[in-house]
From Swiss-Prot:
<feature type="binding site">
    <location>
        <position position="174"/>
    </location>
    <ligand>
        <name>Zn(2+) 2</name>
    </ligand>
</feature>
<dbReference type="InterPro" id="IPR002933">
    <property type="entry name" value="Peptidase_M20"/>
</dbReference>
<dbReference type="InterPro" id="IPR011650">
    <property type="entry name" value="Peptidase_M20_dimer"/>
</dbReference>
<comment type="function">
    <text>Cleaves the N-terminal amino acid of tripeptides.</text>
</comment>
<keyword id="KW-0645">Protease</keyword>
<dbReference type="GO" id="GO:0008270">
    <property type="term" value="F:zinc ion binding"/>
</dbReference>
<dbReference type="GO" id="GO:0045148">
    <property type="term" value="F:tripeptide aminopeptidase activity"/>
</dbReference>
<dbReference type="InterPro" id="IPR036264">
    <property type="entry name" value="Bact_exopeptidase_dim_dom"/>
</dbReference>
<keyword id="KW-0482">Metalloprotease</keyword>
<dbReference type="GO" id="GO:0005829">
    <property type="term" value="C:cytosol"/>
</dbReference>
<keyword id="KW-0031">Aminopeptidase</keyword>
<keyword id="KW-0862">Zinc</keyword>
<feature type="active site" description="Proton acceptor">
    <location>
        <position position="173"/>
    </location>
</feature>
<protein>
    <recommendedName>
        <fullName>Peptidase T</fullName>
        <ecNumber>3.4.11.4</ecNumber>
    </recommendedName>
</protein>
<keyword id="KW-0963">Cytoplasm</keyword>
<dbReference type="Pfam" id="PF01546">
    <property type="entry name" value="Peptidase_M20"/>
</dbReference>
<keyword id="KW-0479">Metal-binding</keyword>
Amino acid sequence: MDKLLERFLNYVSLDTQSKAGVRQVPSTEGQWKLLHLLKEQLEEMGLINVTLSEKGTLMATLPANVPGNIPAIGFISHVDTSPDCSGKNVNPQIVENYRGGDIALGIGDEVLSPVMFPVLHQLLGQTLITTDGKTLLGADDKAGIAEIMTALAVLQQKNIPHGDIRVAFTPDEEVGKGAKHFDVDAFDARWAYTVDGGGVGELEFENFNAASVNIKIVGNNVHPGTAKGVMVNALSLAARIHAEVPADESPEMTEGYEGFYHLASMKGTVDRADMHYIIRDFDRKQFEARKRKMMEIAKKVGKGLHPDCYIELVIEDSYYNMREKVVEHPHIIDIAQQAMRDCDIEPELKPIRGGTDGAQLSFMGLPCPNLFTGGYNYHGKHEFVTLEGMEKAVQVIVRIAELTAQRKS
């Protein structure tokens, strides 16, 4: 495990922040740098069929070291970091034997406090890797990458029995494009696991059904002094639309299996306003009902408008709950749970209040639940990971490979 931390620190030193609204994939040059580094490292380790596609998907195979018809399985992580917070000049702090209390992040006023993040109370005595308060850390998902790379090394060095192990590193997961250019046939695994979760023990195979809603509102602007009966204020229409959206079904009011409507952005003038919502729900019927609700609201608010003024609503599905695909193959979850228990970890099955590459891949024919990385507070300057959590993730990956080798196709 001595190289696990070294690998992680190496990977987070590269700025791989992805960028939304960009046609090219990967969306940023920094992602290519990490992909080329990983390709070189995989080749040096002796993996075969190492390929890097023109869309930035890196794949490789660790060949089986035992005979028999053992199913090929995969492990997947993404190279990009969130657009929500800078990933440039990441300067990790290593806090050994955490004794509790606030951790100063760099030389400013930022702290990592157990008052705000009570999970710290459970991590006494562990080694924490934090930010310096100026950037995110990049544990999402460079912890996953380091864990997969280290697990490959452990399987080789200890000659642990395993079948074919496929690995893949994808770009632009944070902007929803990670799986769009993933060649499932070329990957050629029976099932896979993304290593992109949170705290130790998390095992996730349920995620939101997701859709985006874009609303274009065209009004009519005239001088306010002569506006009666003529002006149609697009901003007022936008306000009326949002007032119709259930206020108690927003992200800040929901948790667990509860879905939500989220107004992510709004801009405009009297003439023209644009609103962008995201809709999330675990239940497919409720998901469809939420989309209908948005259409009904737009129709209600737009009723009776002058023909030159209108409300246009476009709904686009983003991804679906992988549960309906993964539950068709219960052994995938059973093996992961057994692997965790064999590593003295109690599995924590919980829904992902978000999405992963695995959600899309599951609907592309590759069932793909999500394993923990040992990281917390992703997408911001309070992000951190524990070295012990990362070590546990490596152990679980290795044990999954070992258990799968005991299972014949």
